[in-house]
């Protein structure tokens, strides 16, 4: 019975430790350079907050520069991260080593590029084309 109690206390302590867990996150840019690492709380920090931080810390000498956080997509573990999730929810199921920083890949897609380009209208009249092949 005492073993069950100890296991329960250890599980509760693990949940508290996870709530206060500080993680290091670094961001890999398109050219292979990095932003960070920065320390943040895994439960309290959302993906949207990370995107804001990436835009604020973006190097000025890059050819591609995001204007807003909506222009940035973060990828971790092969998945595009959703803005409303926190870091703890986005971790890979196998987990990261505690002593290493979590690397997130940054993709910049300007919002103007997301809109579909208008179809170019061809001013030539449409003609019906037929062909016959005799074998």
From Swiss-Prot:
What does this gene product do?
A: May serve as docking site to facilitate the association of other proteins to the plasma membrane.
Q: What is this protein called?
A: Membrane-anchored ubiquitin-fold protein 4
Q: Which residues form the Ubiquitin-like domain?
A: 23-92
Lipid tethering residues (S-geranylgeranyl cysteine): 132
- Those residues forming the propeptide, per the database entry, are 133-135
How does the protein's chain sit in the membrane according to the entry?
A: Lipid-anchor
* Gene that produces this protein: MUB4
Organism lineage string? Eukaryota, Viridiplantae, Streptophyta, Embryophyta, Tracheophyta
Q: Cysteine methyl ester-modified residues are where?
A: 132
GO CC annotation: plasma membrane
Report whether Membrane shows up as a keyword of the record. yes
State the residue spans of region: Disordered. 1-20
Q: Which PANTHER family match?
A: MEMBRANE-ANCHORED UBIQUITIN-FOLD PROTEIN 4, UBIQUITIN-LIKE PROTEIN 3 HCG-1 PROTEIN
Q: Which organism is it from?
A: Oryza sativa subsp. japonica (Rice)
Fetch the InterPro entries from UniProt: MUB (IPR017000), Ubiquitin-like_domsf (IPR029071), UBL3-like (IPR040015), UBL3-like_ubiquitin_dom (IPR039540)
Question: What's one Pfam family the UniProt record gives for this protein?
Answer: Rad60-SLD_2
Q: Which UniProt keywords apply?
A: Cell membrane, Lipoprotein, Membrane, Methylation, Prenylation
Subcellular compartments: Cell membrane
Name the major location: membrane
């Amino acid at each position: 019975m005492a073993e069950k109690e100890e296991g329960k206390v250890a599980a509760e302590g693990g949940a508290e430790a996870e709530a206060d867990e500080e993680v290091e996150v670094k961001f890999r840019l398109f050219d292979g350079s990095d932003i960070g690492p920065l320390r943040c709380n895994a439960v309290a920090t959302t993906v949207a907050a990370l995107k804001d931080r990436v835009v604020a810390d973006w190097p000025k000498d890059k050819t591609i520069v995001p204007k807003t956080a909506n222009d940035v997509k973060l990828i971790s573990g092969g998945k595009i991260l959703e803005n409303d999730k926190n870091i703890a929810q986005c971790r890979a199921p196998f987990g990261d080593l505690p002593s290493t920083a979590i690397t997130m890949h940054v993709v910049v897609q300007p919002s103007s590029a997301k809109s579909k380009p208008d179809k170019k209208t061809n001013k030539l009249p449409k003609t019906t084309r037929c062909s016959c092949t005799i074998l």
